[in-house]
Curated annotation (Swiss-Prot):
It is found in: Cytoplasm. Its main location: cytoplasm. Residues 241-260 are annotated as: Disordered. It catalyses: N-terminal L-glutamyl-[protein] + L-leucyl-tRNA(Leu) = N-terminal L-leucyl-L-glutamyl-[protein] + tRNA(Leu) + H(+); N-terminal L-aspartyl-[protein] + L-leucyl-tRNA(Leu) = N-terminal L-leucyl-L-aspartyl-[protein] + tRNA(Leu) + H(+). The lineage of its organism: Bacteria, Pseudomonadati, Pseudomonadota, Alphaproteobacteria, Acetobacterales. Transmembrane segments: none annotated. One of its GO terms (biological process) is ubiquitin-dependent protein catabolic process via the N-end rule pathway. Belongs to the R-transferase family. Bpt subfamily. Functions in the N-end rule pathway of protein degradation where it conjugates Leu from its aminoacyl-tRNA to the N-termini of proteins containing an N-terminal aspartate or glutamate. This is Aspartate/glutamate leucyltransferase.
Amino acid sequence: MTYTSPRRPQLFYTTAPMPCPYVAGRMERKVVTDIGGPDAERLHNRLSRAGFRRSHTIAYAPVCPSCSACVPIRVPVASFSPDRTQRRTLRRNATIEGFEVPAHATTEQFTLFQRYQFARHAEGDMAAMNFYDYRAMIEDTPIDTMMIEFRTPEDRLVCVSLIDRLDDGLSAVYSFFDPTMDARSLGSYAIMHLIAHTRRLGLPYLYLGYWIRDSAKMAYKARFQPAEILFHGAWTPLDRDRLPEEGDRGPARFPASLTE
């Protein structure tokens, strides 16, 4: 399909079916588009609000014909209030500091990335990435991208978050952490740090990607409350006691205009 702007047509393609990495026994398809070029920032902002995610210079969204388990989710940061478990996580990691750094790959980051992949996702494609693949993931971006490095008082790197800046918030692209520090819940700590960082920047939302209720890897995103999900093209407060059924969530929707 083609959307036409005054500058150039924006082309969207669907991928071939592939086994879903999140829900066993299902196949996934995505709609993808290249966001490189002079309109990258504007296009990325519009697509992010419509539920798309970025990888390198590509924006994508799920368009699986028989499944709508992937639900875009974001946190209105001004309203976020940590629950009891999250407050314990904040106290447990009080000595860990997050530092904003440019989106440049380092061997120190890559060593931590490999340890995380081998421990958590050994069967996944990312476990086979070499340093050059990792550098491309970090640095191959047409938009305003940054990183947060989380370090102990001894300057040990224990967690890294890759983040895109949007005009209405931050988008958490990918995070990884020391797999030997499970008791610290560093992934949750990183999200709460990003919520606070988004608030300090005066931006309203932290975009967390896709929430999948029945996936152990993705269900945790609904713990950061209040949250909003994209439902039939509109961002709606997430009520965990009255969740929409899969068939009611609707497919990915395109912005009415990609150039506004």
